[in-house]
Amino acid sequence: MRVHDIPINGYCGEGFDAVRTEFERNFAERGEVGASVCVYRGGEKVVDLWGGHVDLERAQPWDENTIVIMNSLAKSMSALCTHILIDRGAIDFDAPVADYWPEFAQAGKAGILVRHVLSHTCGVIYCDAAPPGSWFDWPVHIAAIEAQEPAWEPGTNGAYNSIN
């Protein structure tokens, strides 16, 4: 589908044309069906774009009020916050996680670096000891992460994980 065939609406402030260009490329080159993006800078909305369709049949247009599930949003926010802390010198990308969380070093995890966690190469991809529902019981889930052995040598393999 050509980009001019895809309904794209909204606002893109001065100096943010590159955001609109990439947004359009998602449809034209990357097979996006429907999406939206909103960016605030200094408390001001500078980008508010939406386009495409809600359904694969491309029958229902995506609008500014389309609601979607945001999977794994915490990962990007965690990475953003961690990079801010790195930039401020509060965390070292190449330091062991155990420098900041000593109990994490249990079960062969002493060599896992901050970079391994952020790049999904730490090897801690699940928690054998995590009982059902422990996501909602902070001390229990943290203890399960601390007790978990890595599935591989940190930094040697990568896999999506849902514990960070």
Residue map of PLM features:
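Generic alpha-helical secondary structure signal
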Residues: 14, 18, 112, 116, ...
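Residue-level signature of the cytosolic catalytic core of signaling kinases
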Residues: 12-15, 66, 93, 110, ...
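Residues at or immediately flanking beta-strands
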Residues: 34-36, 96, 157
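Active-site helix/loop module of the DD-peptidase/beta-lactamase fold
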Residues: 64, 69-73, 85-129, 147-149
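Hydrophobic (often cysteine-bearing) scaffold residues that line and stabilize catalytic clefts
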Residues: 15, 19, 70-74, 78, ...
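Catalytic-site signature segments of enzymes, centered on catalytic residues
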Residues: 67, 126-164
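Short, conserved catalytic-motif segment at the N-terminal edge
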Residues: 4, 9-70, 90-92, 143, ...
